[in-house]
Every structure is written in C-alpha cells, then in structure tokens.
C-alpha cells in the first residue's frame, strides 16, 4: 500500500470519528474576503457584528429533512424568482440574489499601486588593491520611480449541496499581478533591501485556492482537497493582504515563509471547542509558484506537511485570535534545500475601533535572506464613523538577515516602519496613501534609511 493511500485513509477515518463542536471566527484570507465583500450594503441580512466580520460562513447546526433538501436545479429556479428587474439591477442586488438562490459568493478586488522610492541607485563599494582577484565587483542597479503594480484578485465560493450529509463548498481564488515600467524587485535592488517594498515584487499569476470542502453535519469537521496555500491562514486581518492592509513585504505576509504559493494537497480541520481549531495537511512539494495546477506532481512522492492550531477567544474587550503554524518543506529542484518553519500570530480587538496584532516567524536553511521576523502594529477601523472602509494603521517589523543566504548583505538586520490611511469612497472604491521607512538597509552600509511612498487605489466588489 502506498504512502498516499495510507495518509488519505487516516484523514478520512479521523474525520468520521471526531464529534466535537465546529470552530468559528478563525481567520482565512479568502473566506474572510468573500464574507466582507458580500456584506457591503446588505439591506436584507442584519448588520454584521465585530465577531461576524471575522467569521467563516457558518454551517447548518440541524439536519435538514429530506423533504426540504434542495434539488439540483433549485438554484436556477430561485435565481429567476428573485426578479432582479423589478428591484433594479445593481451590483448589490445581483450578489444578494446569487447568495440567496445559488449559495454563491463572489469577490472581485482590483488595485493599482504606484510606488515612489529613494534611493534610486544601488551602491557599489570601491575595492582596495588587496581585494582585486579575491572579490567580485558588485553590479550597480538603477531604477526610475514610480513602479506601477496592477493586481487583480477574483474569488468565489459555491455551495454545491447542503443536506443531512453536510455541506459541499467549492472555492476558487486567483491572483494576477502585472507591472508597468519598473517592478518592485528592481526597486528593491536599487534600494539594496533584504525585503521587498510590496507583497508581489514581480509579475505573477497564482492559483492560490482551487478546493472542494466537505463540511460534515453539526459543524464537527471539514475535509478540504485541491490546490491551496498556507498564506491563507498564516496571518491576521491586516498583515496578510496587500489590497486591504499593509503593503511592505514584511507586513503583508510572512517574510520567512518557504511554503508554496499554491499546491495540490488536502487538509483536515477539527474543532475541539467552539473557540479552537486544529488543522493538519499535506501538499505536493514540487509546485512552488502556484502558477498552474500540476496533477502529475502527486505521483512523485514528495510532499510538504503542516500543522496549525488556532484559539479565537472573545473577552470583554472584543474578539481575538492566537495561532501557531508549523510546516516542513522538502528539497526539490525548484527549492534546493529542505526547511522547517514556524509562524506565531496574535491579534486582539481592544475595542470596536482598535485592533492590535503581532507576529513571530522563522525558518531553517538558506532559501531566502530573511530567516527571522518580529512584527507588531495596530489598526483603527472607521474611526470617525464616516465609511466602513476607512482604516488607519501603523506597524513595525524587525527582520534578521541570514548572511549565508544573501552574500552581499552588510548587516544582520533590517527594520521597516509603515503607516497607511485608507479613505473609503462609497461602498466599493478606496484610496490609501502609504509610507514605508526602512532603517539600516541590510545590503547598503553607506545609508541608514530608505523611503517608499505609495498610493493604493482599490476597487472591491
């Protein structure tokens, strides 16, 4: 019997023997985005509370009688019966009709991000006479600001069935990133930084989510198979999504991560209590970039593994989440070193207007220059009760730089301080000026700081 068969059998057996209550309000990047976008201007559903804003869509707690179970064509009939023409065709009405009739949620995020930076030319130290023949002369990189990033991220979740046997949900999320003029990777080289100035430093296309989830009755267990990324759970509300919160590489994701941007696999999620969640899973180790879905890699017998634990308490101050992620990646041609990494995240609402968060993460090996990071920050949402999209945030990240992974690094550390203000313009459009200050750039000993100015325009439908 092969390893794949044993692992899949164990996951299925555990899913059927677990009988605990399902967990709620645990952060998931794409599910939260769908939930947030589909509650804008929602006049039918009640106004979501602070706790619901971080929830995944809850499952039915009672078994549905066979006489009330929906047929295969029921969503089509229900959608026609909504009679959109009578109520006026609009984005809100269309999304509400899809949600009510077909159990479908759709989110479209499109952002344009110009970034100005200084310095613009990298520094090449002069070699002394004793260095000739022993040290290579560093190449000088020059970049002309601004660099323009165009990022499009559509997401969708479709409830295929909802019966006494549970609920089946298909979820997809795709990220497409293009650049005009310079890209962020070139700008980072010119500034001589260890970390990038945004989450996607070069042109990318990522199938970050292409999964089917079987949620078992009574919210006990869920089993997910397909292509997914650990970026979806590794973080908190504002330090894991460049289109919503912070922009810099160290504050918009886990900068030490060596796991895939999207790869085929499966994971099982179990909830011992309503406020805790446990997850264990595996992925194909070969697909690092996630730019396509590579079914043939599953037969190559190399897999990455992860375990995840989350606690989401609710106290007198507000809801919070505290999580730990452990993962192991295998050595493959696309990543020539086996690594083991960890990420500890904490977030807490101090009040309905103030959200604080922190992260400590690290990784073994020499895959990327940053091997440890410590970050913390705070975000105030809708401080003046003007627009639900209004945000004010400030955060700081301290990054340790592994000199073996970055031979040109002159310092063992690099610090970034970032602040942004999102200004909502109606329910869908927002603008966010952002400022990044880098203290002691790791690759530039002759400069003590570098600066990045950005203005993010985001359309979230």
UniProtKB/Swiss-Prot annotation:
GO CC annotations on file: cell outer membrane; pore complex
GO molecular function: porin activity
UniProt xrefs under Pfam families: OprB (PF04966)
Protein name, entry field: Porin AaxA
Example GO biological process: monoatomic ion transport
Subcellular locations according to the entry: Cell outer membrane
Gene3D superfamilies documented for this protein: Carbohydrate-selective porin OprB (2.40.160.180)
Superkingdom assignment: Bacteria
Chief subcellular location: membrane
Family classification: Belongs to the OprB family.
Membrane topology reported for the UniProt record: Multi-pass membrane protein
Record key words, sorted: Amino-acid transport, Cell outer membrane, Ion transport, Membrane, Porin, Signal, Transmembrane, Transmembrane beta strand, Transport, Virulence
Signal peptide region: 1-22
Keyword Hydrolase among UniProt keywords: no
Known role: Facilitates L-arginine uptake, as part of the AaxABC system. The arginine uptake by the bacterium in the macrophage may be a virulence factor against the host innate immune response.
